Amino acid sequence: MKNLISLGVFLLILLSVQVNAQEQSVLKIRPTGRILMDGGLFHSDNKNFVDGVAIPDARIGVKATYGKYKAKVDIGYAYGKVSLKDIFVERQFSSYALLRVGNFVHQFGLQSSTSSSMKVTMEEPASNEAFFNSRLIGAMFVYDKNDFFGTASVHVESEALKKKSNELGKMGYGAMSRLVYRPLHDTGRLFQLGISGAYETPRYNSEPTLNHTSFDLGANFPTRIAKVRAVNALIPDAKNLIKFTPEMIAGYGPVALEAQYYYLQVNRKKDFKNYKASGMYGILRGLLIGGNYRYSHTDCGIATPDSGSLECVFGYNYTDMSDTRSHIYGGRLNDVSFTVNYYINKYMIWRFRYSYTKITDRVG
């Protein structure tokens, strides 16, 4: 871990010096970390749901800045495994434009702006898990000025971080973009509309006959204590994937609404029918204590409430991964949730979540 951090900082310094050797800047390094502790009680006919407690995420890392450059290295630990999280360098071209290169979460809809520990529903909506990508090696250009926010990304598949190219056999790639218009982004007055789109080639699969000719999509039940698959669709004979998601934020005073719709299509080879899936979620938020909701330009979304705030969140998610025309039945998911968030201080959050999840029309 020490060697990885040193390499990231060294790369940052090297790039800064090459671009402008005469620029007088100060190197600033700040440690980062996170601990997520969770406990849950379950009622289900599925024996895989066992009551318990867990530490599903622990992080340690470092952020560095030098002039117009920033870098981040983040290492995660969960259930006996160490994994690389954010590893990137970014160059600030102006107060409203930057380029980021490395392994990170690329912008695709509202949920891509917040980390896994900052989801207001405690667990991210199942539709986002099913149709979104996690961290990917690539480059992303960001434009963030006044009423407009836009990103453009190119990337390779997620397995590129874990396996050498000869082990992959082939490397999948893709591109995505997020465009947002936000005419109201003042404290207590929020309104935002946006749309994201993406294109991908088939991904790695350990089964040789499916390797880079398929997509394996799905989502777990909304808990990290017991990891149980809720919906899952394996789409063979795939040529490429396209998807898009419109988004909306509306807020007045201490009340706000967030919503997204997802559409995904896998174009397939030969005479196989294309696979189509969709989903949506809506989140109604209210601050019982803490004043009005504020806007975060950096996240392109609602800012984290102030310390001492108490928030109630009602959520509904629908995910449809069963397509009768292509004869792929990944399942249909309905989830209703209620979450209470208490923002203890700048560094600590206490959450309580109750949810009811139902799965239908799934084969396998």
Pin down the residues of each PLM region.
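Bacterial Sec-dependent N-terminal signal peptides
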Residues: M1-Q24
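Short hydrophobic/aromatic segments of transmembrane alpha-helices and their interfaces
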Residues: N3-L4, A54, F131-F132, N240, ...
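Hydrophobic alpha-helical membrane context
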Residues: L14-Q18, Y69, V363
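Outer membrane beta-barrel
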Residues: E23-F42, K47-A160, N166-R203, G286-L288, ...
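Outer-membrane beta-barrel pore domains
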Residues: D45-K47, L210-G364
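A short, polar/proline- and glycine-enriched secondary-structure boundary/capping micro-motif
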Residues: S83, Q111-S112, K162, R268-D271, ...
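Extended ligand-binding clefts on enzyme/binding-domain cores
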Residues: R189-L217, I235-D237
